[in-house]
Amino acid sequence: MSSAIAAKTMTQTWQTVCTRADLVPYSGVAAWVETPEGPAQVAIFYLPGHAQELYAIDHHDPFSKANVIARGIVGDLKGQPVVASPIYKQHFRLEDGQCLEDESVQLRAWKVSFKGDEVWIEA
Amino acid sequence: MNTPAKPQLIVIGNGMVGHHLVEQLVEQGATERYTVIVFGEERHLAYDRVHLSEYFSGRDADSLALSTADYYAENGIELRLHEAVTAIDREAGEIVTPKGRYPYARLVLATGSYPFVPPIPGNERDGCLVYRTLEDLDAIREAAESASTGVVVGGGLLGLEAANALRGLNLDTAVVEFAPRLMPMQVDSEGGELLREKIEALGVQVLTGRATQEIVDGERSRHRMVFQDDKVLETDLIVFSAGIRPRDELARDCGLEIGERGGVVIDDNCLTSDPAILAVGEVALWNNSIFGLVAPGYQMAKAAASTLLEGGTAFAGADMSTKLKLMGVDVGSIGDAHGDRTPGARMFRFLDPLKQQYRKLVVSSDGKRLVGAMLVGDNSYYDTLLQYYANRIELPEDPAALILPAGSEAAPALGPDALPATAMICSCHNVTKADVCATIDGGAVDLGAVKGETKASTGCGGCAALLKTLVDHELESRGVEVDKSICEHFHYTRQELYDIVRVEGIKTFSELMEKHGNPETHKLGCDICKPAVASILASCFNEPITDAAHIPLQDTNDTFMANMQKNGTYSVVPRIAGGEITPDKLVVLGQVAQKYNLYTKVTGGQRIDLFGARLEDLPAIWGELIEAGFETGHAYGKSLRTVKSCVGSTWCRYGVQDSVGMAIRLENRYKGLRAPHKIKFGVSGCTRECAEAQSKDIGVIATENGWNLYVSGNGGMRPRHAELFATDLSDEELFRYIDRFLMFYIRTADRLQRTSVWRENLEGGLDYLKEVILEDSLGIGEELERQMQAVVDTYVCEWSNAISDPEKLKRFRSFVNDARPDPDIIYTTERGQLRPA
C-alpha cells in the first residue's frame, strides 16, 4: 500500500495515488488525495479497453452523505459512462460528475491518468 | 366517551350480486357511514356460480370463491355465514334468524333465486336433485356414484350446463325440454335444430316437446319418467333445471310489494315499497322483469350502493345479450334476437349445415340499425355485432356481410377505432371505452394495469378479447411500444436472457454482452442488467460471486457480502439454520460484536444481525465467525434468506413433526441459491402455525401424515397468504416439489419479482403451476431437479472462499492508498448500544 505523496503547495499538483493492480476492472476503488484545502476522498473507476480507461469523481454521495460512490455499479446510460450510488441509486456521469436525476447536483471530477502502471490524480 | 353508534346496514344474501354489493359499498365508502352485517344462508362465502360446472372438472370451493373472510374483516364488515334469515320485522326494524334478532336502519335483499321444480308427481323421490349451489353439486356427485344414467329436465342455459356436468361425471345423459327446441329463449327453431345436432353429436340424448307427467319406479333404472304421449325414459338420476324463481318469501311475509309472478318490486334506485329496504339481483323485479344474468345484478348492486349514500347512480335496465359456450358449442344472443319485439324488423339469415353454423341478424325497418342477433356454432362474430347493437352504430350498406363467413364478402370486424367513447366494453363492471382510455392516459401501460384499475374483464370475462384489442390499439396509437427489454443493453426479458445463458452455456457477463448486447451502447451494462445477469449466472453455474469476472456485476451488498447501511457501514448476518443455535455459538456472536463495537438486533428471520461493521473490518469479523463454525447467511443476496421454524414435536406438546429438523434440512439444501429476488421459508410443526409459514415464499406445515406445502406467500408491503399447493407429502416429495418450484420460478420470473407477484402474473394461475410442478405437464420436472442438485452440489460458503484468497481481500480496503478509517463514520449511543450519529 503506497502512501499519498502530496506536494504541499497552494496550487494543484499531480500526485500518485496507487497502481494499476489496486484498481478493479469495470468497477471502482476509493483513495485519499491531498488538496490545497486538505485531504479528500476520490472514487477511481477503471474501464480497460474503453476509449477513456480512467475516471475519478468524488467518493462522497451528497444524497446519503456517506462516502460510498466507489462501491456503486458502473455502467453506461444513453451513451454516457455512469456510476450508480449504492445507497439510493442515483446515477453520476463519470466524465463530469453530473447527477442524471438531479440537475442541481454535480460531483467534482478529478483529472486522472496512468503513468506507466501508476495512477496519478491532479488535486 | 363513546362515539355515537353508526346506523346498521344489513345485507341478506352472499351470492355473486350480494358480494358485489359489498364491494361497491366498500368502494363508495359506505363502511364509514354504516355498520355493515352480511348474512349468508350457505356455508360458503360468495362464489362464482357462472363457472359452477368447473367444480366437477377440478376446481374446488376455494378457487371458485370470489373473496376471502379477510377482505370482509379488513373492511370492518361482519360476515355471518350459514345463518339464514327467517323473517323481517318491519315494525321493529329488525331481522330474525335462528340465532337472534338484529336491528337495521337500512336493509338490502340479495336473496337471489331458487331453481324451479315443475309440479310433477314423484319429483320429491331420492335422486331427484337441482343444480344451483355447491351443496347441490355435492349431492349430484354423491348420487352419481351409484348411477349410470342421468336426465336433466330443462334445455335452457342452466339445463345444458347441468347436462354437461352429468356428462363429466360419466353418466349417460339426456336432456328433456318442454319447448319444441333447446334454449328457446335464445335461439329460434333453425338455431335450435343446429344446437340439437351438435349436442347429440356429443352423446347427449335430446328430447324436446316433452312434458313429464309423472316419475315412478323404473324397471331397469331407479326412476321412470312418463311423458304426455305415454312414452317413457328410465334413469338413475334426475336434475331439475327448468328456470329460476325469485327468493321473495321474506319480502312476501313482511308485506312488501311483490310482482304477479313473483319478485320484489323495485324502482330505479333499487328501493322496494318500503324505502328502508332495497333489493338487488335475481330477487328483484324491475319494470316487470327479473334479470337472470350476473351483469344486470352487478349494475343493480352499484345503483343500490349509490342509493344508500348520496344517490346519483340509478338502475336503468340492462341488456340481456349473452354469449356462452355450452358443451363446447358457441351460442350467442343479442337484443331482440327473435325480432318479435320490433315492429317492421327485417331478418338476415346464414346457415351452413356442414360446418354447423347459424347466424341471424334482426335489423330495423329502415335497415340502418341492428336490433338483435343470434349465433350458433361460432361466437367470433359476437363482439362486433354487440357493438353495432349497443352503440347504435349505423350498419354498412349490406348488413348481410356482417354474418357471412370471413374471407367471402365479409365486412371487416369493427375495429376499436370505430367504437364511440361511450361503447360498453365490460358490462359486468360497467366499463366503457372512454374509461379504458382514461386509465391509459392516467398512466396504465399494459392490459394488467387496465384490468386492475377498471376491473374490466374480471367478471364473466366475456369481453377479454375485445378489451385486449382495445388496450393494444390505444397503447399503439399513443406511440407506446410495448417493450419488455430488461434495459437499454439487452433487447431481451430476464426470462429470455436466462434461456440464452442456459442454452448457450454462457458463463460471463462480457461474453453475453459480446454475443447479445445492444451494439449501440458502450456495452458496460448498468445497475439493472448487471445484477440480473449476475443472478442468472449464479443460478445456472453457481461460481463464487467474488470471482474477478463477476465482481463488477454485483450490487454493493453482494460485492462485500454484507448489507450496506445508510452511513456506508455494513451489517453482518451469519446463517443460523432454522433459528437453532448452540449456547457456544451465541457467546461467539456476543464476543465478536463487543470486539468490533457492533450494534446487535434479532431479526424477523430468527437470526442475529450485527450492525455498524466498517468495510475494512469485515474480513477479520468473518475470520472469527468462520473459526467458530459459522457460515455466510446471504442476508445481502437475492437468494434464500431464512427458514423460520417453530420448535416442533421435539419439545412442543402439540407438534406432530420435527419442524426444526426439517427447517435445517431445507435451509442447508437451498442456502446459496440465487434467484430473481429473495426467498423466505417457514416450517411449522402443527396447524397452529407458529412459524407463520403461510406468509413465506415456501411454507411447510406438518400434518399427522407428513407435510402440507404452501407457496407464494409474502409479508412486506403487500402481504399475501401462501396457497395450499400439495398435501401430506413425504420428506422426499417435499424436496422434489420445492426443487421444481424454485427452479421454475428462477427460470421464468422477472427481475426482482417475488414468488407472490410471479405467481399472480403466471398465466393459468395456481392450476397451471400445479400441473407443471406436481403433474410435470411440461416434462421438465427431472431437468429442474437436476439443475437444483447442481446448485446444491456446488455450494461453498462465499466468505470462506473470499478470506482464503488475498487477491479477493484487497477489495475490502476502504482506501487503496491509506489504512486510515473513514473519519465521516460517526456514532453516538442509544439504549446502551451505538447507532449512526
Regions found by a protein language model. Give the residues of each.
Chain A
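N-terminal pre-ligand scaffold of iron-sulfur
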Residues: 1-79, 93-94, 106-123
